[in-house]
C-alpha cells in the first residue's frame, strides 16, 4: 500500500493529510491566528504558587498564565534564580519555585478551552533521529527498536556526543542509520541549544526563546520514519521551503517531494474534505451495519458501539464479537483522525465470553500500535467498559474547526417547541402578577410562533382568559428556538 502526505496551503492556513492505502488516517491543521505552541521554549516568570494544588502559574506572554505542576519540574531543572543546577529531593511546589522567579519552561500542551498551556521544565529538542535533553546525562532508545544489537550499537555511537550540555533519546527513525548522520543530528541539536542559552543570557529577553517548526516541516520531520512514497504540495512557496528543509535535514525525502499543480483541489484526490466533515459527526458507520457514537467532552471522550442493522450471524455472541472486532479498527482510526486525547471510555457491546473479551482487547492494542501518539489501555472495568488514555498535546480537529453552538451552548440539545410554548405562557402569568398592562406581545422564533397560533392556541386562549388580557404573537426570524420576549403593551 502507498502512503503519502498531501500539503494544502491557503492564506493563513496550512493543512497536512496523511494518506495510507488511499484512506485518510490523520489530518493536521494550523492557522496563523491560532498557531500551536507545543514544543516552544520560554523564559517565563512565576506569577503565582499554589501549594494546595502542588502547582504554579507561569507568565509566558500569553493571554492566560500557563500551568506548571510539581511533577513536571525535573530534578535537573536549572533554577534561573541562581544558575547552579539543583538535585531536588523535596517535591513540595513551594520549595521548588517561588513567586517572581524566572524559569525556563517548554509547552507540552496547547491552551484548551478555559485551561492555559501546560508546561514542563524537562526541556527537549527533537530532530529527525534524536531528541536532545539538556541537563540529562544518559542515552535512551525508542522501544520500537526491537533488535538488541542495534540498540546497543546506537547507544554506543550516540553516547560519544553526551557531555555536560545534556543527553539524548534515540528515535525510531535512527534504526540502521550510519554514525555520520547521527553525529550531524547531534551537532545540529547542540547548536540550537547553544543559541537558546545565548538568548536566555540577554537581559532584555523575555518569553519565547525557541519556536517549533511550522506545520509542514514538523509533520515531515515526524513522518520521516514512515514508509512515505511521496509528498505533494499545492503551494509553490511551501514546496520550495520544504525542498530546502529536506535537503538539509532529510535528504532522502527530497526526491519524494512534488509540486502539485492539477486543476482538481489536492484534497479531492482522496475525498479528504468529506472525510474531515465525517470526523466532526457523532455517528461513525461500520461496514457491517453497526456504528459508533463518539462524544467529546471536557472531561473525557466516550465511544459507544452498537450492532445497528448487523444481524449477519445466527449466533448472537458471534454477531456481537464480530461487531466489536470491527469497531476496534474504526476506533483506532477515529482517535488519530480526530486527534482525541486524554481519558477515553469505550463501551463495547456486552460479551459474556471471556475469550471474546481478550481477543477484542488484543485487536484494539494491535490497531493502536500504528498510532504515533502514546496510548495506554487499562482493560475492561467491572462495569464492562474499556478505559484507556491517549496523550493529548494539541487541540482536537473539532476544537480547531468548530465553535460552541450559539443555540444550545454546547449542550447538544435544544428545548422542544412545546417546552418553549409553555415557558412563554408561564412568563405571561408571572409578568401579569408583577406589573399592570393592557395586553401582551410575544416575540418568538418561527416554529414557536406557529405552534402558539396552531396546536397550542387553545392553551394560549386559556392563559388570555386567566390574565384577562389579549396576547398577540409575532414572528422574530432571527430568534433561535429557545429565544422569546414577552412585552407589555
UniProtKB/Swiss-Prot annotation:
Its cofactor is Mg(2+). This is Ribonuclease G. Pfam families: RNase_E_G, RNase_E_G_Thio, S1. It comes from the Bacteria. The gene is rng. Belongs to the RNase E/G family. RNase G subfamily. Its EC number is 3.1.26.-. InterPro entries: NA-bd_OB-fold (IPR012340), RNA-bd_AU-1/RNase_E/G (IPR019307), RNase_E/G (IPR004659), RNase_E_G_thioredoxin-like (IPR048583), S1_domain (IPR003029). NCBIfam families: PRK11712.1 (NF008689), RNaseEG (TIGR00757). The keyword tRNA processing applies. Keywords: Cytoplasm, Endonuclease, Hydrolase, Magnesium, Metal-binding, Nuclease, RNA-binding, rRNA processing, rRNA-binding, tRNA processing, tRNA-binding. Disulfide bonds: none annotated. It is found in: Cytoplasm. Disruption phenotype: No visible phenotype in rich media. Significant accumulation of a 16S rRNA precursor. Increased resistance to aminoglycoside antibiotics kanamycin and paramomycin. Increased lifetime of speF mRNA.
Amino acid at each position: 500500500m502507498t502512503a503519502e502526505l498531501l500539503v494544502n496551503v491557503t492564506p493563513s492556513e496550512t493543512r497536512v493529510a496523511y494518506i495510507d492505502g488511499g484512506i485518510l488516517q490523520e489530518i493536521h491543521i494550523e492557522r496563523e491566528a491560532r498557531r500551536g505552541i507545543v514544543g516552544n521554549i520560554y523564559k517565563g516568570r512565576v506569577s503565582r504558587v499554589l501549594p494546595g494544588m502542588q502547582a504554579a502559574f507561569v507568565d509566558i506572554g500569553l493571554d492566560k498564565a500557563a500551568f506548571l505542576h510539581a511533577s513536571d519540574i525535573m530534578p535537573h531543572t536549572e533554577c534561573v534564580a541562581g544558575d547552579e543546577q539543583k538535585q531536588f529531593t523535596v517535591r513540595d511546589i513551594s520549595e521548588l519555585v517561588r513567586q517572581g522567579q524566572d524559569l525556563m519552561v517548554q509547552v507540552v500542551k496547547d491552551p484548551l478551552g478555559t485551561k492555559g498551556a501546560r508546561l514542563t521544565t524537562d526541556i527537549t529538542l527533537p530532530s529527525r533521529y534524536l531528541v536532545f535533553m539538556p541537563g540529562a546525562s544518559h542515552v535512551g532508545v525508542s522501544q520500537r527498536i526491537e533488535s538488541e544489537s542495534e540498540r546497543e550499537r546506537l547507544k554506543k555511537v550516540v553516547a560519544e556526543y553526551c557531555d555536560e550540555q545534556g543527553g539524548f533519546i534515540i528515535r525510531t527513525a535512527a534504526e540502521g542509520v550510519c554514525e555520520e548522520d547521527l553525529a550531524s543530528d547531534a551537532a545540529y541539536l547542540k547548536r540550537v541549544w547553544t543559541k537558546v542559552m545565548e538568548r536566555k543570557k540577554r537581559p532584555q529577553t523575555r518569553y519565547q526563546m525557541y519556536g517549533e517548526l511550522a506545520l509542514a516541516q514538523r509533520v515531515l520531520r515526524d513522518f520521516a520514519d514512515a514508509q512515505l512514497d511521496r509528498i505533494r504540495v499545492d503551494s509553490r512557496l511551501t514546496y520550495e521551503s520544504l525542498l530546502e528543509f529536506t535537503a538539509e535535514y532529510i535528504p532522502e525525502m527530497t526526491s519524494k517531494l512534488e509540486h502539485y499543480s492539477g486543476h482538481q483541489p489536492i484534497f479531492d484526490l482522496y475525498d479528504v474534505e468529506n472525510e474531515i466533515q465525517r470526523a466532526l459527526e457523532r455517528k461513525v458507520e461500520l461496514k457491517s451495519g453497526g456504528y459508533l457514537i463518539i462524544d467529546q467532552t471536557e472531561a473525557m471522550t466516550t465511544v459507544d458501539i452498537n450492532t445497528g442493522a448487523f444481524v449477519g450471524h445466527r449466533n448472537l455472541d458471534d454477531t456481537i464479537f464480530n461487531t466489536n472486532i470491527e469497531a476496534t479498527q474504526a476506533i483506532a482510526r477515529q482517535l488519530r483522525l480526530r486527534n482525541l486525547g486524554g481519558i477515553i471510555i469505550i463501551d463495547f457491546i456486552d460479551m459474556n465470553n471471556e475469550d471474546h473479551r481478550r481477543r477484542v482487547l488484543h485487536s484494539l492494542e494491535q490497531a493502536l500500535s500504528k498510532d504515533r501518539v502514546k496510548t495506554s489501555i487499562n482493560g475492561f472495568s467491572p462495569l464492562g467498559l474499556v478505559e484507556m488514555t491517549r496523550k493529548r498535546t494539541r487541540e482536537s480537529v473539532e476544537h480547531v474547526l468548530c465553535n460552541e453552538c450559539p443555540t444550545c451552548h454546547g449542550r447538544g440539545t435544544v428545548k422542544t417547541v412545546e417546552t418553549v410554548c409553555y415557558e412563554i405562557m408561564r412568563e405571561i402569568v408571572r409578568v401579569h402578577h408583577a406589573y399592570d398592562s393592557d395586553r401582551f406581545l410575544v416575540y418568538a422564533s418561527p416554529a414557536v410562533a406557529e405552534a402558539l397560533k396552531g396546536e397550542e392556541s387553545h392553551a394560549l386562549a386559556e392563559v388570555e382568559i386567566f390574565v384577562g388580557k389579549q396576547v398577540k404573537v409575532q414572528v422574530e426570524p432571527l430568534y433561535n428556538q429557545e429565544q422569546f420576549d414577552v412585552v407589555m403593551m
